[in-house]
């Protein structure tokens, strides 16, 4: 049996009235608007009391800041004290103030050793010099200086005897037998320069052969490890100057200069000896 539209509306009206009578509509309305039983948060932000922040007195903050600054200063000072570069410059400043003495450490050796550790502010050239025992270096210098002195003494004795042979024609110093066995080239005054130059070349060659033997025994290079000029040139970075292998060229120039200096010294000795012998 089908119901008419009027009957359907009547039945729906009765059902709604029954629901309202049970209070279901009021409960849903309260949930929507935030009433009793609502799931919405009805707490207002204005109802909350602000948190009270306790103010720290400035007198309490200032000591803390001072203590932190003081701690930073102390840590910085300690780091500087532990820095080997700072310690090196401090020692150099003390040496300049007190004056150099025999116990003053070698500046170039210290900088060279510092560069070898990688802490040096000065960039070194590609040719790095290995650290050598200072006592071994001093022993090598002693051997080389002794060899130089002995070589010079022997040369001057031979040159002085040769000068006597040329300038004194009587038999007071050289008997006739000695003169008779010597070739004429040694007794002729015109050949003095040739004999002198030949003698210098032979003496210099023997000297350098003996010095190479000393280097092999001690393991120290005379110019590379003991010359302060070479140490200074080694601090120049490669490429700054338009000269390839600057250190090697300086070493070669110093070798030639040593030869020339020895010859100049011998020439001066010969001139003085000739002047003295001629007065006898």
UniProtKB/Swiss-Prot annotation:
Keywords: Endoplasmic reticulum, ER-Golgi transport, Golgi apparatus, Membrane, Transmembrane, Transmembrane helix, Transport. Residues 167-191, 280 are lumenal. It is a multi-pass membrane protein. Belongs to the GET2 family. Its main location: endoplasmic reticulum. Pfam families: GET2. Residues 1-17, 44-62, 71-80 have a biased composition (Basic and acidic residues). Required for the post-translational delivery of tail-anchored (TA) proteins to the endoplasmic reticulum. Together with GET1, acts as a membrane receptor for soluble GET3, which recognizes and selectively binds the transmembrane domain of TA proteins in the cytosol. The GET complex cooperates with the HDEL receptor ERD2 to mediate the ATP-dependent retrieval of resident ER proteins that contain a C-terminal H-D-E-L retention signal from the Golgi to the ER. It comes from Candida glabrata (strain ATCC 2001 / BCRC 20586 / JCM 3761 / NBRC 0622 / NRRL Y-65 / CBS 138) (Yeast). The keyword Transmembrane helix applies. One of its GO terms (biological process) is retrograde vesicle-mediated transport, Golgi to endoplasmic reticulum. PANTHER family: GOLGI TO ER TRAFFIC PROTEIN 2. It comes from the Eukaryota. It is found in: Endoplasmic reticulum membrane; Golgi apparatus membrane. One of its GO terms (molecular function) is membrane insertase activity. Component of the Golgi to ER traffic (GET) complex, which is composed of GET1, GET2 and GET3. Within the complex, GET1 and GET2 form a heterotetramer which is stabilized by phosphatidylinositol binding and which binds to the GET3 homodimer. The chain crosses the membrane at residues 147-166, 192-211, 259-279. Residues 1-146, 212-258 are cytoplasmic. Residues 1-80 are annotated as: Disordered. GO terms for cellular component: endoplasmic reticulum membrane; GET complex; Golgi membrane. This is Golgi to ER traffic protein 2.
